[in-house]
Amino acid sequence: MRSGSPTTISAPAVVFIHGAFMSPESWDPWRQRFEARGYKTVAPAWPFLDHSVDELQHAPDPRFGRLGIGEIVDNYAAIIREQGQPPILVGHSFGGLFVQLLLDRGIGAAGIAIDPAPPKGVLPGANAVRASLPVILGWGSWEKVRWMPYKNFQWGWVHTLSEPEQRAAYDQHVIPTSGRLFFQALLAQLTDVTKVNYRNHLRAPLLIIAGELDRTVETRMVLANFRKYARSTAVTDYREFPGRTHWICRQPGWEEVADHALDWLAKQLGAAP
């Protein structure tokens, strides 16, 4: 499998940002497809997650439970700023939120946010809260490494797949996450940790993608996120894919989503080399 370790980014490049419960390896098919179109790619891990899926499933670093949104975004900002030309940013779920936060800081040449966790000002739906319950319930969850039970993965991520496909996806990809991360997301309206300047006219182009059947980040949340940018003159586009769940980047037909992203990038920035 590919390493998620940061490597030198040279232009043009794409930085793939994973979300909660996933590792950089979840982006492998997308990286291969983008590289086939001429892009260089890298998928840096969140702090404490630069290990194999097997290692993370069996022995996660306990410090990971106290990792917050600010630390993760700062880590990506440092990685990107040490490189040369600003890269393209692609993120899923929390990764999609991080893409927006980074672009708002002036980091990145363009961004693609897929089923993004909501920035401040976008209220989570009932299903999003339900999807978070296994993480936030339990004494001390604020500072602990937390798991997503298989039944919650079935319900919130892969409900259109067969049970054998669901089990295989869970066993091969799902890792623990930070409890603090989810508390910050659910309390986002009370703090500025996920605040985005929706009127930032200098922001790089942004494509926001939703999955019609997503239960974890419902379509209405993604559309509300997109509409928040209505008063900005910066390019902001929206696309909803029918039949897609929160597993949109890996479920059958993911190639259509990736190709739409590639075509959008070609339109915004010019063709890849």
Region spans (language model):
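Active-site glycine-rich loops that stabilize anionic/oxyanionic intermediates
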Residues: 19-22, 93, 212
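Flexible "cap/lid" loop of the alpha/beta hydrolase fold
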Residues: 107-141, 181-189
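Short beta-strand/loop motif that positions the catalytic acidic residue
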Residues: 202, 208-210, 214
